């Protein structure tokens, strides 16, 4: 059990113990190696995309690739907030995290995660303008406007993370301190609160639901218009290139949003599949982003070849 501090009112939790993901003991070493390799590949893959964007003047001046570079930066940080603790889950050591560390992790997890939600929406809007309004695209979406929109996404994400962290840790925690999860996240932490959590669960449902649902609906609306525009393209090659560009984004969005909706719109429930679902958008998605966008994007591949060729 973690440390507690006696007060005149009750015992106050000063740290939490992360129980991690359920796994067979005989697979501990293998899982440690797998997640460690995934983490290293995630960092290297996203760093490679960032360096490619910065090294190629043609790419770093275009909104589509500015957004892709920001996504890679977010993926690196989101992965660093969650995966190292998940890796420790497969070691014999006790996975204790200080109370303040738990607060910080929950804040950054939701800050970065919600910022990523907003960024996916901006990426869909950018593709909508590029395909549906090609002649007006340079006016409607330029580097300066893209920078302002990205800054707005960061501010909105920070506000979302602050709201969730404040609401979660304003509650008293005076009893059990074992978090049945691999990170400090809202549903798992709320189960340990020494107070009624109905209001928190409702706010989580509404707040996360509004952010996720509104972003997802805007993305679907953008792609409905995009598909309609693509079907009007007369050349087969033109349709193929447009679908290829948009297909990468749709794959990433699906892998990210479906697990989020599964977990946070059921905040009061306890499902053993929650941990597996969370692995998708905390571990798998940051790894897939550089692979999908690199392998399916001819311009990125060409830029990589130019850089590696010197």
UniProtKB/Swiss-Prot annotation:
It comes from the Eukaryota. It holds the Pfam family 7tm_4. GO terms for molecular function: G protein-coupled receptor activity; olfactory receptor activity. GO terms for cellular component: plasma membrane. Disulfide bonds join 102-194. SUPFAM superfamilies: Family A G protein-coupled receptor-like. The chain crosses the membrane at residues 30-50, 59-80, 105-125, 145-165, 203-222, 243-263, 275-295. GO terms for biological process: detection of chemical stimulus involved in sensory perception of smell. Residues 1-29, 81-104, 166-202, 264-274 are extracellular. Odorant receptor. Belongs to the G-protein coupled receptor 1 family. This is Olfactory receptor 10G2. It comes from Homo sapiens (Human). The lineage of its organism: Eukaryota, Metazoa, Chordata, Craniata, Vertebrata. The gene is OR10G2.
